[in-house]
Amino acid sequence: MSKVSNGGGDSKNTLYCSFCGKSQHEVRKLIAGPTVFICDECVELCMDIIREENKSSMVKSREGVPTPQEIMAVLDDYVIGQKDAKRVLSVAVHNHYKRLAHQSKNSDIELAKSNILLVGPTGCGKTYLAQTLARIIDVPFIMADATTLTEAGYVGEDVENIILKLLQAADYNVERAQRGIVYIDEVDKISRKSDNPSITRDVSGEGVQQALLKIMEGTVASVPPQGGRKHPQQEFLQVDTTNILFICGGAFAGLDRIISARGEKTSIGFGATVKSVDERRIGEVFKELEPEDLLKFGLIPEFVGRLPVIATLEDLDVDALVQILTEPKNALVKQYQRLFDMENVELVFHDDALRAIANKAVERKTGARGLRSIMEKILLDTMFELPTLEGVREVVISGDVVDGSARPLYIYAERQDEKGNVSA
């Protein structure tokens, strides 16, 4: 119901939104219904909720899983660029769950699993792609760090701890866990330390690759429900990893030089044109990746063989980083604007400020991951001062603020009122 305020001697009624309680003076538009009112902000919020529900209950294909186009459409909402990688992932995930539906029909033909390897520079969106995928298809999803894994019997995490974490994410529902997704990050850090055999065991490199082979291929893992060490008297949960989709990701620093060296061998003669690594972007070089390059990098043949789908990601340029700052549903600029909105302050970024932030991230070679730290540094003083300042309505960030040659511009309510009176 609408609220009515007489405002002292004013005989005009003030109308209020029946949902959020804001007055007609606080919103752009107030829509009247039979006995209720709704503001434009609440309408927009309702539309966002409906869109999210439509995305989460996407139209299914005949096999009961999202089609590649539907998966790609949702990825586009959250991840900027990386079109080729998104297509590869969309098809791979669709086929994986189609295979699960096919198995339940007891067909004579057994469809093999296709695990995925994501190769791309730091901060290009490998981990974020995997997280977004898990959100789309609503299955248990966990992330594991390959650098913490060691062979069984050594100090560090056992590879079976990965399955335990997945089981915990599925609330100990074994059947649901067996259809989940595991993302193993920093997989390039478990490469073989050297080509020469050594008398000492490589427990965090090749040893981890060997340990991962079985669970990636498919085995029944005995997982202690409470975690920790296994005891003979303990009851174990049996988890079949055959249908768990494994996605491995890594930056593979130095792999571009291996790929370029292979290309130089094939380009010989007076007419051959060979670009050096410095002249080409890393993402461009990664597009020529072959399994033999991964072997030279230090991955063992059996491990590479269990990752048949390889998706390469491009390094992000300034334009892509500006898009990442502003366009996705949970873009960084939108996040900070929401924080400032809690103080009833509007945060505004000029276009030159966004490009300056993107340029800094490119110079640091940190990709999208470095954008937040740059934003935090720019806004730190403002976020420190703002809660104690009165009357601030707007904070404006220009390119000079990003460069450090100026302070953010504070616009106070009184000045805005003065501008309104002048224009009137």
Curated annotation (Swiss-Prot):
Biological process terms in GO annotation: cell division; proteolysis involved in protein catabolic process
Binding site for Zn(2+): 17, 20, 39, 42
Keywords linked to the UniProt accession: ATP-binding, Chaperone, Metal-binding, Nucleotide-binding, Zinc
Record-linked SMART domains: AAA, ClpB_D2-small, zf-C4_ClpX
Cross-referenced Gene3D superfamilies: 1.10.8.60, ClpX chaperone, C4-type zinc finger domain (6.20.220.10), P-loop containing nucleotide triphosphate hydrolases (3.40.50.300)
InterPro entries, per the entry: AAA+_ATPase (IPR003593), ATP-dep_Clp_protease_ClpX (IPR050052), ATPase_AAA_core (IPR003959), Clp_ATPase_C (IPR019489), Clp_protease_ATP-bd_su_ClpX (IPR004487), ClpX_bact (IPR046425), P-loop_NTPase (IPR027417), Znf_CppX_C4 (IPR010603)
GO terms under cellular component: HslUV protease complex
Source superkingdom: Bacteria
Pfam families: AAA_2 (PF07724), ClpB_D2-small (PF10431), zf-C4_ClpX (PF06689)
Single GO MF descriptor: ATP binding
Cross-referenced CDD domains: RecA-like_ClpX
Binding site for ATP: 121-128
Entry annotated with the keyword Isomerase: no
Residues of the ClpX-type ZB domain: 5-58
Subunit composition and interactions: Component of the ClpX-ClpP complex. Forms a hexameric ring that, in the presence of ATP, binds to fourteen ClpP subunits assembled into a disk-like structure with a central cavity, resembling the structure of eukaryotic proteasomes.
NCBIfam families (alphabetical): clpX, PRK05342.1
HAMAP family xrefs: ClpX (MF_00175)
Main function: ATP-dependent specificity component of the Clp protease. It directs the protease to specific substrates. Can perform chaperone functions in the absence of ClpP.
Family as reported in the entry's similarity comment: Belongs to the ClpX chaperone family.
Protein's name according to its UniProt entry: ATP-dependent Clp protease ATP-binding subunit ClpX
Organism of origin: Brucella abortus (strain 2308)
